[in-house]
Protein backbone atom coordinates (compact mmCIF):
# COMPACT_ATOMS: atom_id res chain seq x y z
CA UNK A 1 0.00 0.00 0.00
CA UNK A 2 1.41 3.46 -0.94
CA UNK A 3 2.74 5.53 1.96
CA UNK A 4 0.87 8.79 2.54
CA UNK A 5 2.65 12.10 3.10
CA UNK A 6 3.07 12.52 6.86
CA UNK A 7 2.54 16.27 6.54
CA UNK A 8 -0.53 16.84 4.34
CA UNK A 9 -1.85 13.25 4.65
CA UNK A 10 -3.41 13.64 1.20
CA UNK A 11 -0.76 12.94 -1.42
CA UNK A 12 1.47 9.93 -1.88
CA UNK A 13 4.92 10.23 -0.30
CA UNK A 14 7.77 10.18 -2.82
CA UNK A 15 10.69 10.27 -0.38
CA UNK A 16 11.78 9.74 3.20
CA UNK A 17 13.76 12.74 4.39
CA UNK A 18 17.31 11.72 5.35
CA UNK A 19 17.39 14.56 7.87
CA UNK A 20 14.17 13.84 9.80
CA UNK A 21 12.91 10.46 8.58
CA UNK A 22 9.54 11.95 7.59
CA UNK A 23 7.78 10.56 4.50
CA UNK A 24 6.75 13.51 2.32
CA UNK A 25 5.16 14.28 -1.02
CA UNK A 26 7.08 16.51 -3.42
CA UNK A 27 5.24 19.72 -2.56
CA UNK A 28 5.60 19.26 1.19
CA UNK A 29 9.30 18.41 0.81
CA UNK A 30 9.90 21.53 -1.29
CA UNK A 31 8.13 23.70 1.28
CA UNK A 32 9.95 22.14 4.26
CA UNK A 33 13.36 22.41 2.58
CA UNK A 34 12.83 26.04 1.54
CA UNK A 35 11.34 27.07 4.90
CA UNK A 36 14.27 25.58 6.83
CA UNK A 37 16.69 27.65 4.74
CA UNK A 38 14.50 30.73 5.29
CA UNK A 39 14.60 30.08 9.05
CA UNK A 40 18.39 29.72 8.89
CA UNK A 41 18.67 33.06 7.07
CA UNK A 42 16.32 34.97 9.36
CA UNK A 43 17.43 33.48 12.69
CA UNK A 44 21.09 34.24 11.93
CA UNK A 45 20.29 37.65 10.40
CA UNK A 46 22.43 36.85 7.36
CA UNK A 47 21.22 39.71 5.16
CA UNK A 48 19.92 43.27 5.39
CA UNK A 49 17.49 44.91 2.99
CA UNK A 50 19.21 46.75 0.14
CA UNK A 51 22.38 44.65 0.18
CA UNK A 52 24.05 43.31 -2.95
CA UNK A 53 24.86 39.62 -2.51
CA UNK A 54 27.15 37.52 -4.73
CA UNK A 55 26.23 33.83 -4.92
CA UNK A 56 29.31 31.66 -5.41
CA UNK A 57 28.31 29.67 -8.50
CA UNK A 58 30.21 26.60 -9.70
CA UNK A 59 27.42 24.92 -11.66
CA UNK A 60 27.30 22.05 -9.15
CA UNK A 61 24.25 20.90 -7.21
CA UNK A 62 24.92 22.99 -4.09
CA UNK A 63 25.45 26.35 -5.78
CA UNK A 64 22.63 25.72 -8.28
CA UNK A 65 20.16 24.90 -5.49
CA UNK A 66 21.45 27.90 -3.53
CA UNK A 67 20.88 30.25 -6.49
CA UNK A 68 17.40 28.81 -7.09
CA UNK A 69 16.33 29.00 -3.43
CA UNK A 70 17.88 32.44 -2.82
CA UNK A 71 16.00 33.90 -5.79
CA UNK A 72 12.78 32.18 -4.70
CA UNK A 73 13.00 33.30 -1.05
CA UNK A 74 14.10 36.82 -2.00
CA UNK A 75 10.86 37.15 -3.97
CA UNK A 76 8.62 35.17 -1.57
CA UNK A 77 9.66 37.06 1.56
CA UNK A 78 10.76 40.34 -0.01
CA UNK A 79 14.30 40.29 1.39
CA UNK A 80 15.08 43.30 -0.80
CA UNK A 81 18.42 41.88 -2.00
CA UNK A 82 20.20 42.40 -5.30
CA UNK A 83 21.53 38.95 -6.27
CA UNK A 84 24.48 38.25 -8.58
CA UNK A 85 26.31 35.09 -9.66
CA UNK A 86 30.09 34.95 -9.15
CA UNK A 87 32.14 32.10 -10.63
CA UNK A 88 35.82 31.18 -10.49
CA UNK A 89 37.52 29.54 -13.47
CA UNK A 90 40.39 27.51 -12.02
CA UNK A 91 41.59 26.44 -15.45
CA UNK A 92 40.79 22.71 -15.31
CA UNK A 93 40.27 21.43 -18.84
CA UNK A 94 37.42 18.96 -19.19
CA UNK A 95 35.89 19.97 -15.86
CA UNK A 96 35.58 23.67 -15.09
CA UNK A 97 35.07 24.72 -18.71
CA UNK A 98 32.09 22.34 -18.89
CA UNK A 99 30.65 23.39 -15.51
CA UNK A 100 30.85 27.06 -16.48
CA UNK A 101 28.54 26.32 -19.40
CA UNK A 102 26.01 25.18 -16.79
CA UNK A 103 26.55 28.43 -14.85
CA UNK A 104 25.89 30.43 -18.01
CA UNK A 105 22.62 28.56 -18.51
CA UNK A 106 21.72 29.24 -14.86
CA UNK A 107 22.36 32.92 -15.50
CA UNK A 108 19.69 32.90 -18.20
CA UNK A 109 17.29 30.68 -16.22
CA UNK A 110 17.41 32.84 -13.08
CA UNK A 111 17.99 36.15 -14.89
CA UNK A 112 20.89 37.10 -12.62
CA UNK A 113 24.07 38.99 -13.64
CA UNK A 114 27.19 36.79 -13.86
CA UNK A 115 30.87 37.59 -13.27
CA UNK A 116 33.62 35.05 -13.99
CA UNK A 117 37.18 35.51 -12.66
CA UNK A 118 40.02 33.15 -13.56
CA UNK A 119 43.19 31.93 -11.87
CA UNK A 120 45.12 32.72 -15.03
CA UNK A 121 43.89 36.31 -14.98
CA UNK A 122 44.54 36.78 -11.25
CA UNK A 123 47.66 34.68 -10.65
CA UNK A 124 49.13 33.89 -14.05
CA UNK A 125 48.62 30.15 -13.45
CA UNK A 126 45.90 27.61 -14.24
CA UNK A 127 45.28 24.51 -12.13
CA UNK A 128 46.32 22.36 -15.08
CA UNK A 129 49.71 24.10 -15.08
CA UNK A 130 49.99 23.89 -11.27
CA UNK A 131 49.26 20.15 -11.26
CA UNK A 132 52.07 19.64 -13.78
CA UNK A 133 54.39 21.31 -11.24
CA UNK A 134 53.18 19.79 -7.95
CA UNK A 135 51.46 16.54 -8.96
CA UNK A 136 48.17 15.27 -7.55
CA UNK A 137 49.15 15.04 -3.88
CA UNK A 138 48.98 18.70 -2.80
CA UNK A 139 47.10 20.37 -5.64
CA UNK A 140 43.95 20.90 -3.53
CA UNK A 141 45.97 23.11 -1.17
CA UNK A 142 46.76 25.50 -4.03
CA UNK A 143 43.21 25.44 -5.37
CA UNK A 144 41.58 26.06 -1.98
CA UNK A 145 43.82 29.01 -1.14
CA UNK A 146 43.58 30.60 -4.60
CA UNK A 147 39.83 30.02 -4.87
CA UNK A 148 39.06 31.72 -1.59
CA UNK A 149 41.04 34.79 -2.56
CA UNK A 150 39.63 34.76 -6.11
CA UNK A 151 36.07 34.88 -4.74
CA UNK A 152 36.99 37.88 -2.60
CA UNK A 153 38.67 39.65 -5.50
CA UNK A 154 35.71 39.00 -7.78
CA UNK A 155 33.33 40.25 -5.10
CA UNK A 156 35.38 43.44 -4.74
CA UNK A 157 35.18 43.99 -8.50
CA UNK A 158 31.39 43.72 -8.22
CA UNK A 159 31.31 45.95 -5.12
CA UNK A 160 29.03 43.52 -3.27
CA UNK A 161 28.16 43.63 0.43
CA UNK A 162 28.26 39.87 1.05
CA UNK A 163 29.14 36.54 -0.54
CA UNK A 164 27.01 33.46 0.06
CA UNK A 165 28.37 30.02 -0.69
CA UNK A 166 26.77 26.60 -1.14
CA UNK A 167 28.51 24.90 1.79
CA UNK A 168 26.06 22.33 3.16
CA UNK A 169 25.80 20.44 6.46
CA UNK A 170 27.99 17.60 5.20
CA UNK A 171 30.72 20.08 4.16
CA UNK A 172 30.70 21.79 7.55
CA UNK A 173 30.79 18.49 9.47
CA UNK A 174 33.66 17.24 7.28
CA UNK A 175 35.59 20.44 7.97
CA UNK A 176 35.10 20.03 11.73
CA UNK A 177 36.49 16.48 11.53
CA UNK A 178 39.43 17.57 9.35
CA UNK A 179 40.40 20.34 11.76
CA UNK A 180 40.14 17.98 14.74
CA UNK A 181 42.36 15.43 12.98
CA UNK A 182 44.88 18.14 12.04
CA UNK A 183 44.79 19.78 15.46
CA UNK A 184 44.06 23.10 13.77
CA UNK A 185 42.53 25.04 16.66
CA UNK A 186 42.27 28.37 14.82
CA UNK A 187 40.25 26.90 11.95
CA UNK A 188 38.26 24.62 14.25
CA UNK A 189 37.11 27.66 16.17
CA UNK A 190 35.68 29.42 13.12
CA UNK A 191 34.74 26.64 10.67
CA UNK A 192 31.21 26.22 12.06
CA UNK A 193 30.40 29.94 11.91
CA UNK A 194 27.45 30.56 9.59
CA UNK A 195 28.77 34.02 8.79
CA UNK A 196 32.48 34.83 8.70
CA UNK A 197 34.03 38.27 8.82
CA UNK A 198 36.20 40.25 11.16
CA UNK A 199 35.74 43.87 12.04
CA UNK A 200 38.15 46.02 10.09
CA UNK A 201 39.97 43.19 8.28
CA UNK A 202 38.76 44.43 4.90
CA UNK A 203 37.31 41.07 3.89
CA UNK A 204 33.83 40.82 2.42
CA UNK A 205 31.54 38.90 4.81
CA UNK A 206 30.63 35.34 3.75
CA UNK A 207 27.66 33.26 4.80
CA UNK A 208 26.31 29.73 4.39
CA UNK A 209 22.51 29.64 3.98
CA UNK A 210 22.69 25.85 3.39
CA UNK A 211 24.69 25.19 6.57
CA UNK A 212 22.04 22.85 8.03
CA UNK A 213 20.86 21.33 4.72
CA UNK A 214 21.91 17.70 4.18
CA UNK A 215 23.70 16.93 0.93
CA UNK A 216 21.26 14.08 0.21
CA UNK A 217 18.32 16.47 0.50
CA UNK A 218 20.00 19.01 -1.78
CA UNK A 219 20.36 16.25 -4.40
CA UNK A 220 16.70 15.26 -3.95
CA UNK A 221 15.56 18.88 -4.22
CA UNK A 222 17.57 19.41 -7.42
CA UNK A 223 16.28 16.11 -8.84
CA UNK A 224 12.58 16.70 -8.16
CA UNK A 225 12.81 20.36 -9.22
CA UNK A 226 14.62 19.24 -12.39
CA UNK A 227 17.31 21.88 -11.87
CA UNK A 228 20.10 22.20 -14.42
CA UNK A 229 23.39 21.38 -12.68
CA UNK A 230 26.81 19.83 -13.40
CA UNK A 231 27.37 16.57 -11.51
CA UNK A 232 30.93 15.52 -12.43
CA UNK A 233 33.55 15.45 -9.64
CA UNK A 234 36.72 17.49 -10.05
CA UNK A 235 39.29 15.37 -11.89
CA UNK A 236 42.00 16.41 -9.42
CA UNK A 237 40.09 15.74 -6.17
CA UNK A 238 40.22 11.92 -5.61
CA UNK A 239 43.35 12.22 -3.46
CA UNK A 240 42.05 15.13 -1.36
CA UNK A 241 42.36 14.74 2.43
CA UNK A 242 38.71 15.77 2.74
CA UNK A 243 37.74 12.47 1.10
CA UNK A 244 38.87 10.53 4.19
CA UNK A 245 36.76 12.73 6.49
CA UNK A 246 33.81 12.31 4.10
CA UNK A 247 34.10 8.50 4.10
CA UNK A 248 34.29 8.44 7.92
CA UNK A 249 31.24 10.72 8.20
CA UNK A 250 29.23 8.54 5.80
CA UNK A 251 30.01 5.50 7.95
CA UNK A 252 28.80 7.36 11.03
CA UNK A 253 25.66 8.53 9.24
CA UNK A 254 24.74 4.98 8.21
CA UNK A 255 24.61 4.04 11.90
CA UNK A 256 23.28 7.34 13.25
CA UNK A 257 21.51 9.63 10.71
CA UNK A 258 21.85 12.64 13.02
CA UNK A 259 25.67 12.30 13.04
CA UNK A 260 26.11 15.19 10.59
CA UNK A 261 24.19 17.70 12.70
CA UNK A 262 25.70 16.24 15.90
CA UNK A 263 29.24 16.92 14.63
CA UNK A 264 28.28 20.48 13.62
CA UNK A 265 26.74 21.17 17.04
CA UNK A 266 29.84 19.75 18.73
CA UNK A 267 32.00 22.13 16.70
CA UNK A 268 29.73 25.06 17.57
CA UNK A 269 29.98 24.41 21.31
CA UNK A 270 33.76 23.88 21.48
CA UNK A 271 35.63 26.55 23.41
CA UNK A 272 39.34 27.32 23.41
CA UNK A 273 41.12 27.44 26.78
CA UNK A 274 42.40 30.78 27.96
CA UNK A 275 46.08 31.11 27.29
CA UNK A 276 45.97 29.31 23.93
CA UNK A 277 47.69 31.65 21.50
CA UNK A 278 45.57 32.35 18.43
CA UNK A 279 46.85 33.88 15.17
CA UNK A 280 46.46 37.66 14.91
CA UNK A 281 44.99 38.80 11.60
CA UNK A 282 46.91 41.43 9.68
CA UNK A 283 47.45 42.12 6.00
CA UNK A 284 49.87 40.69 3.45
CA UNK A 285 52.80 43.02 2.80
CA UNK A 286 52.75 42.12 -0.89
CA UNK A 287 49.10 42.00 -2.01
CA UNK A 288 47.22 43.51 0.96
CA UNK A 289 45.01 40.46 1.50
CA UNK A 290 44.17 39.40 5.07
CA UNK A 291 46.91 37.26 6.62
CA UNK A 292 48.35 36.30 9.99
CA UNK A 293 51.85 36.26 8.45
CA UNK A 294 53.95 38.85 6.62
CA UNK A 295 52.97 37.17 3.34
CA UNK A 296 49.57 35.57 2.81
CA UNK A 297 49.37 31.88 1.90
CA UNK A 298 48.49 32.76 -1.69
CA UNK A 299 51.62 34.87 -2.14
CA UNK A 300 53.78 32.16 -0.52
CA UNK A 301 52.42 29.52 -2.91
CA UNK A 302 52.84 31.85 -5.90
CA UNK A 303 56.40 32.63 -4.84
CA UNK A 304 57.17 28.91 -4.87
CA UNK A 305 55.55 28.35 -8.26
CA UNK A 306 57.31 31.31 -9.85
CA UNK A 307 60.68 30.25 -8.41
CA UNK A 308 60.28 26.66 -9.57
CA UNK A 309 59.84 25.57 -5.92
CA UNK A 310 56.17 24.53 -5.96
CA UNK A 311 56.25 22.85 -2.54
CA UNK A 312 57.61 25.95 -0.79
CA UNK A 313 54.37 26.71 1.04
CA UNK A 314 53.50 23.11 1.89
CA UNK A 315 54.66 20.90 4.73
CA UNK A 316 58.03 21.25 6.46
CA UNK A 317 59.89 24.52 6.07
CA UNK A 318 63.45 24.52 4.83
CA UNK A 319 66.02 26.61 6.72
CA UNK A 320 66.00 29.14 3.84
CA UNK A 321 62.21 29.50 3.98
CA UNK A 322 62.35 32.73 6.00
CA UNK A 323 64.89 34.25 3.64
CA UNK A 324 62.69 33.48 0.65
CA UNK A 325 59.58 34.95 2.25
CA UNK A 326 61.52 38.03 3.30
CA UNK A 327 62.20 38.40 -0.44
CA UNK A 328 65.96 38.38 0.14
CA UNK A 329 68.05 37.30 -2.85
CA UNK A 330 69.47 33.76 -2.83
CA UNK A 331 72.90 32.76 -4.02
CA UNK A 332 73.18 30.36 -6.97
CA UNK A 333 74.30 27.64 -4.54
CA UNK A 334 71.24 28.20 -2.33
CA UNK A 335 68.93 28.09 -5.37
CA UNK A 336 70.44 24.74 -6.44
CA UNK A 337 70.06 23.30 -2.94
CA UNK A 338 66.43 24.38 -2.69
CA UNK A 339 65.48 22.85 -6.03
CA UNK A 340 66.90 19.53 -4.84
CA UNK A 341 64.86 19.57 -1.61
CA UNK A 342 61.60 17.65 -1.25
CA UNK A 343 59.73 19.94 1.18
UniProtKB/Swiss-Prot annotation:
Belongs to the TtcA family. CTU1/NCS6/ATPBD3 subfamily. GO terms for molecular function: nucleotidyltransferase activity; tRNA binding. The keyword Membrane does not apply. Pathway: tRNA modification; 5-methoxycarbonylmethyl-2-thiouridine-tRNA biosynthesis. Its EC number is 2.7.7.-. One of its GO terms (cellular component) is cytosol. Its main location: cytoplasm. It comes from Danio rerio (Zebrafish). It holds the Pfam family ATP_bind_3. Plays a central role in 2-thiolation of mcm(5)S(2)U at tRNA wobble positions of tRNA(Lys), tRNA(Glu) and tRNA(Gln). Directly binds tRNAs and probably acts by catalyzing adenylation of tRNAs, an intermediate required for 2-thiolation. It is unclear whether it acts as a sulfurtransferase that transfers sulfur from thiocarboxylated urm1 onto the uridine of tRNAs at wobble position. It is found in: Cytoplasm. PANTHER family: ATPASES OF THE PP SUPERFAMILY-RELATED, CYTOPLASMIC TRNA 2-THIOLATION PROTEIN 1. Keywords: Cytoplasm, RNA-binding, Transferase, tRNA processing, tRNA-binding. The keyword Cytoplasm applies. One of its GO terms (biological process) is tRNA thio-modification. SUPFAM superfamilies: Adenine nucleotide alpha hydrolases-like. Gene3D superfamilies: HUPs. This is Cytoplasmic tRNA 2-thiolation protein 1. It comes from the Eukaryota.
Amino acid sequence: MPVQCSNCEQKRAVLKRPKTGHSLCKDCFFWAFEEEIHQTITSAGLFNRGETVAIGASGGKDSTVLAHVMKLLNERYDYGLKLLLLSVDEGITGYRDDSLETVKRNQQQYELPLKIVSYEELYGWTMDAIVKQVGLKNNCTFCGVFRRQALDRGAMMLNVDKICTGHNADDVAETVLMNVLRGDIARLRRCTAISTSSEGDGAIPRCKPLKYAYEKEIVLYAYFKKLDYFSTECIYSPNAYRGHARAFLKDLESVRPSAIIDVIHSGETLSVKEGVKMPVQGTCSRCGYISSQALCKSCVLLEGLNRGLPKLGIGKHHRLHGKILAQEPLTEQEERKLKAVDF
